Amino acid sequence: MLENYKHTTVLLDEAVNGLNIRSNGTYIDGTFGRGGHSRLILSQLGPEGRLLAIDRDPQAIAAAKSIEDPRFSIVHGPFSDLSHYVRERELVGQIDGILLDLGVSSPQLDDAERGFSFMRDGPLDMRMDSSSGQSASEWLMKAEADDIAWVLKTFGEERFAKRIARAIVERNQVDPMTRTKQLADLIANASPFRDKHKHPATRSFQAIRIYINSELEEIERALDGALEVLAPQGRLSVISFHSLEDRIVKRFMRHHSRGAQVPAGIPLTEAQLRSMGGRTLKALGKMMPGDAEVAENPRARSSVLRIAERMPT
């Protein structure tokens, strides 16, 4: 049941304040989750305001049914397709703010049946949308050790990636793993050193989840789409939860806030310089949760909020 899983929205006020809400504006919550950000945005909109929410998790779509508000609508799909949803509604260049809350939500982690958690035994699934794509167990069954090791190293920065990958392949050849506890125990046994502050399966579970859901590619596409549809002076507010996510967001905002970089000594006319394009975003800085929020919600500890504004054309 949805109500069994509490979700505390991280950096709630800060992320919504970063959108600089106008009462008659049009906004996108690209990651509805359980609706914390959406409800706060709606509370600041007037009768003419509009909010489009997006989520690829069927449980999030079900949770959105509790919002009976003519200003609100939701799409079941990946946030990477946000520009497509905007084009369908003929709203390109009219979006006043976009909020993205990246990563996995507390209800997804806490529901053992979703297969995201190494702390709770459940099916080895890890899909954000369990109705499409391959599950973690299906991929691990057919993947080569080198491919698994690459995923663990690239997306989890796991120092024992090769050792763990070999152990996974050897185990699956004898007794295929279908449960999260089986994988978590195998990783713990394959890891020669323990960090007393972190479960040995933390990085590997993160890596497999990111790969299964193409999370980093989804972020890159969503950011490009956001830039395409934002109105002049429209805001982009993005919360990330680990360094791989934040690195993508940081580089994107930095790149588009600098404009075209011309090497010194190359002669260009004014027309050529204009054709190369200038700054399209103004980075407005970053925020992290305070001690009080981290004490109340430990999962907020690694979160980073970055805000940018679309430059006038």
Curated annotation (Swiss-Prot):
Q: Which HAMAP family match?
A: 16SrRNA_methyltr_H (MF_01007)
Q: This chain belongs to which protein, by name?
A: Ribosomal RNA small subunit methyltransferase H
User: Into which family does the record put it?
Assistant: Belongs to the methyltransferase superfamily. RsmH family.
Where is it predominantly found?
cytoplasm
Q: Where does S-adenosyl-L-methionine bind?
A: 35-37, 55, 79, 101, 108
> Which catalysed reactions does the entry list for this protein?
cytidine(1402) in 16S rRNA + S-adenosyl-L-methionine = N(4)-methylcytidine(1402) in 16S rRNA + S-adenosyl-L-homocysteine + H(+)
Top-level taxon of the source organism: Bacteria
Per its UniProt entry, what is the enzyme's top EC class, as one word?
A: transferase
Classification via NCBIfam families:
16S rRNA (cytosine(1402)-N(4))-methyltransferase RsmH (TIGR00006)
Its Enzyme Commission number(s) read: 2.1.1.199
The organism's lineage is:
Bacteria, Pseudomonadati, Pseudomonadota, Gammaproteobacteria, Enterobacterales
Give the location in the cell.
Cytoplasm
Purpose: Specifically methylates the N4 position of cytidine in position 1402 (C1402) of 16S rRNA.
Name the gene behind this protein: rsmH
**Keyword annotations from UniProtKB, A to Z:** Cytoplasm, Methyltransferase, rRNA processing, S-adenosyl-L-methionine, Transferase
Give an example GO cellular component term for this record: cytoplasm
The Gene Ontology biological process annotation of the record reads: rRNA base methylation
Question: Which InterPro entries does the record match to this protein?
Answer: RsmH, SAM-dep_MeTrfase_MraW_recog, SAM-dependent_MTases_sf
